[in-house]
């Protein structure tokens, strides 16, 4: 007999939840059952971001660097940056070069004497912020045009010393504050468009993930910051959605959801030990497969060779 000739098996959210409820010793019956299972699935996806590197969530990004600007937004939903380089002469075979840039801690960045020094960036500090926008905390005290690089607000008391603000639909980066005036403003950040804004427009803080480079990019050549990030897994969504998870992780996902669901249904507690064991085993199998397969070689540093 012939095989099906297809390899497209997948489950939508409704089928995933139904399977999980059956493993937990119950049945999917009500709309609330679906809602609570979807919530548990989203919580589990958040937990997966803490368990290791999920290779299917890798994405490459490129930022064109501006001379004199040292801080740049990274897309909201970024879990972490995995690799990063400074690229010069981009998109031309004879000139493109990717140069090393080292990630440093906040402690190391804080000890740099002159953070405004300009040259080719060789170090970067990544701030893993949550991407949330606060409620309005102040307002503009005067109208600004699309090209203004100084912005006056009614009160800067609640603003961080440097960072991003949202005015109407525009994200603006400011370098420092003096009094109630924001200076060294970079307009139209985070894929927004620089625009004019009227006096009394609301100002909110944006906690955007960001990289700060040192030295600050100079104008000797055109630089790009090229990075590979691990993004968040997409939310579970509605009942007809398929999950943002490769087929190899489907057994793990269903086993995990069954374990989460069993904690919330009558009679589910007695199944928890076996469901937890099944989830842990399924996770380990999937995680062991979800890894780099490239060869690796360890070479001792020259300073240690020959030392007794």
Question: What is each stretch, according to the model?
Answer:
Residues 55-67, 94-102, 131-204:
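Autoprocessing Asn-cyclization modules and mimics
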Residues 1-135, 204-308:
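Glycine-enriched, solvent-exposed interface loops adjoining structured elements
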């Amino acid at each position: 007999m012939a095989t099906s000739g297809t390899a497209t098996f997948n489950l939508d959210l409704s089928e995933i939840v139904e399977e999980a409820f059956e493993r937990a010793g119950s049945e999917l019956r009500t709309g609330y059952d679906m809602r609570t299972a979807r919530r548990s699935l989203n919580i589990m996806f958040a937990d997966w971001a803490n368990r290791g590197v999920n290779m299917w969530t890798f994405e490459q990004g490129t930022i064109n660097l501006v001379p004199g600007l040292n801080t740049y937004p990274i897309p909201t939903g970024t879990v972490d940056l995995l690799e990063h380089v400074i690229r010069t002469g981009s998109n031309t075979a004879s000139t493109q070069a990717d140069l090393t840039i080292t990630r440093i801690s906040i402690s190391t960045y804080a000890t740099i004497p002159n953070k405004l020094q300009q040259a080719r960036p060789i170090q970067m500090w990544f701030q893993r912020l949550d991407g949330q926008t606060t409620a309005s905390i102040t307002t503009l005290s005067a109208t600004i045009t699309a090209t203004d690089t100084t912005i006056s607000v009614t009160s800067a008391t609640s603003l961080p010393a440097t960072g991003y603000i949202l005015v109407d639909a525009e994200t603006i980066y400011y370098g420092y504050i003096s009094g109630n005036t924001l200076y060294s403003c970079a307009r139209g950040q985070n894929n927004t468009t620089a625009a004019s804004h009227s006096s009394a427009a609301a100002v909110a803080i944006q906690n955007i993930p960001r990289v700060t480079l040192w030295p600050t990019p100079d104008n000797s050549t055109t630089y790009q910051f090229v990075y590979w990030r691990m993004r968040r897994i997409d939310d579970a969504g509605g009942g007809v959605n398929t999950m943002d998870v490769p087929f190899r992780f489907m057994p793990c996902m269903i086993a995990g959801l069954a374990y989460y669901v069993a904690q919330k249904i009558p009679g589910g507690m007695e199944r928890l030990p076996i469901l937890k064991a099944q989830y842990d085993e399924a996770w380990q199998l999937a995680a062991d497969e979800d890894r780099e397969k490239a060869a690796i070689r360890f070479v001792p540093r020259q300073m240690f060779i020959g030392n007794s």
